[in-house]
Amino acid sequence: MDKNETFYALCHGDRGQAGWKYFVAWESGKMGAVSPHDANTNPPAFEVDATTAGGVAACNGCGGSVSMPSVFDRIKSAAGAAAGFIADGMQVASDSEREARQSICKTCPLNEAGSCVGCGCVIELKTQARLEQCPAGRWFPEICAAIPITDPIRNLIYHVLPVARNSNWKRNLDQLVLRQDLFNGKRVLAIAYEPRESGGGRIVPTVQPDEVLAYCDEIGMNWTDSRAFVNDTNLGEVVSFPWLLETVKSTNPNELTFYAHAKGVTHSDNHTTVKWAERQYRVCLDDWAAVQRALEQYSIVGSFRRFGEFATPGNHRWHFSGTFYWFRNDAVFSRIWNKVDRLYFGVEAWPGKMFKPEESACLFADNAGGMYLETEWEKLQRQIDVWEVARR
């Protein structure tokens, strides 16, 4: 097939992306994983191992190196862990949970002579306490017994507002196509748009739905269903969200759904929302083993969890900042799932309306700050490095 700038960007990727396997394919002239239509060679698609990187090869080039925390920080961390253990009544994790944690830690690159480079804790002790959590998000607090998931159906429901003045909606789809093989169930797209004849008022100029679908065809992003919605600048994703949920409605205990939206489409191409989006795709989709493990223990999981906002009726006042999250279908659709606040932030607030904080797990950057600020990303760099090194 012909090479072009779009495919080159998809393959090579930037810091925090997971395109190395595709970059190797690019250099060898085999792009079968993205668009296998070369009439001469027609190379087969890459095999997907959903237990490792969710259909995208783990990236060996992301993140920096990680050093053991200072003695002071290790003492501080140990003191905090001890205080938490005592406050929890010194409850230990179940035998099966401890074994699973220790098995993960045994081969982890962060394991340095029995201590975790990520947090500085002694692994043997850390894995005992039920409320401890891996600093790299590979195992989580054991609040309740796990509900095993077997051969899960993995759905994707996705919202895009294709703002015309920048390429960020394409950038998001470029991220998604690299990981689409993770989704073995439904892949459902909602497109919010402004009709061509619109004018005046709070209008966000967009490209038309047919152009979005054409771009998806160009890069090989396949959908099982799609629908266009006239954009409402006061409600945003809230307009399409009930329909998206309806398309995956099921109480199958082995069915899981990922919701996301094209992030940063109203901002410039070099805004902090670009790295925010890339980090969310990476964390939520590139280590399926960790995500499944979290979903076996919690009803909903995501990244950049924050507390204290969205004081609407019935909301438990927590959310995944950035609005990327996985949920168990049986946990959602066995409840009243279609009450979405008719406010612009309704979809971001929805998890906190559905579930208490203890029913959720954070895959990365718990208690996150304001991610629109570059200073917050500077603070997060060590967490990024820890997450990446743990998956090398």
Language-model regions, residue ranges each:
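Interfaces that engage single-stranded nucleic acids at replication/repair/recombination sites
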Residues: 11, 24, 125, 145-150
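Cysteine-centered metal-binding/redox modules
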Residues: 46-147
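Short, hydrophobic/amphipathic alpha-helical patches that form generic packing surfaces
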Residues: 22, 118-125, 242, 349-353
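Membrane-proximal basic amphipathic "stem/tether" segments
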Residues: 6-13, 67-83, 151, 373-392
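Short, flexible helical or helix-coil boundary motifs
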Residues: 27-31, 82, 86-89, 180, ...
